[in-house]
Amino acid sequence: MATLSEAYTETPLHLQHIIPIDFDSVKEVPESHSWPRSGDESPRRILSLDGDHFSLPAIDLDSPDAIKMVGHACKVMGIFQVTNHGIPSSLLREVESQAWQFFSLPAIAKVRAVRSPGGATGYGVARMTPFFNKFMWHEGFTMMGSPLEHAREVWPHGYGKFCEAMEDYQDKMKALSERLLAMILKYLGISEHDIDWPRLRSNPCSALQLNSYPQCPDPGQVMGLAPHTDTFFLTILHQKDSAHGLQFHREGRGWVPVFPMDGALVVNVGDMLHIMSNAMFPSVVHRVITNEKRHRLSMGYFYGPPMDFRVGPIHRLMQTSGQEVAARFRSITVKDYVQMKAKNLDKALSMIRIR
Ligand code: OGA
Ligand code: NI
């Protein structure tokens, strides 16, 4: 069974594109991390006129209309929040606290968990770093299942609580992802016979990504996470209370901030759901700015199909109301798409688009 790490072996990274700077030791923003002050790439550029007053809809998953609302939000925005999601707040606090413990360590200790050049898991900067001229004000820790291999390098005798919290969180996030995906398919009128549901669920490709955006001497100069779309079906994001920074891009509106809402999780559509829905659901472009003088933490759970699964527009979706709708994408295995994205980032989607 292919793994995500195997998909990355063809695109190994240099250590300079893995190991973050020592954020504790910088007194001013280095040139390497200073983004343009104007232009499309500028972190300062917020086109949204009324963005500050916009709040992303929160859908109560226990509501009788939840399926309709989730489907509608996927179609119109590609991003929404959910409440009554079943993830205990005690678990969210515990994962936050474990993540803080890790990111508060000195740089020399964190680097013991460093991601390998062709690997997918461990400590490091965002994998898309080589595609940009400047570095991001960000450090991350990625895991797929048990983080034991990395955690025990960091805490040889005290990794138990960290691993336990991360594994429990991933189990519950997986169940929530399946619940959301089932709701979305139901909204689309897709039955479990229309797609290979048992196989889709049997060995899903998923990852938990802890993100840390350290305090910055001049937040307006740096980019937390550069604009991107997520690769898999969907992402479920928890933002630690008061520290906001996530923004998504809306046509005609610009960058819209997503303020953390107590008890709510952010869900966004990724490339693979965009492909399977035959472009009905947008794979939402988002970024993170470090606009506050405080350390920000978030936890993203990425949920996708197994590595050898073929993603393509769902056949049944193209035969609605007696009319044949043309497929907008050719189908591709998850592994090939992940590799294509590792080599081409945002160009990957257009490479499989049928014109
Ligand atoms: C990501 C991401 C947003 C955030 O990890 O892909 O978009 O708020 N994170 O940290
Ligand atoms: Ni993302």
Briefly describe each language-model feature range.
Residues 1-355:
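Peripheral, non-catalytic segments flanking oxidoreductase cores
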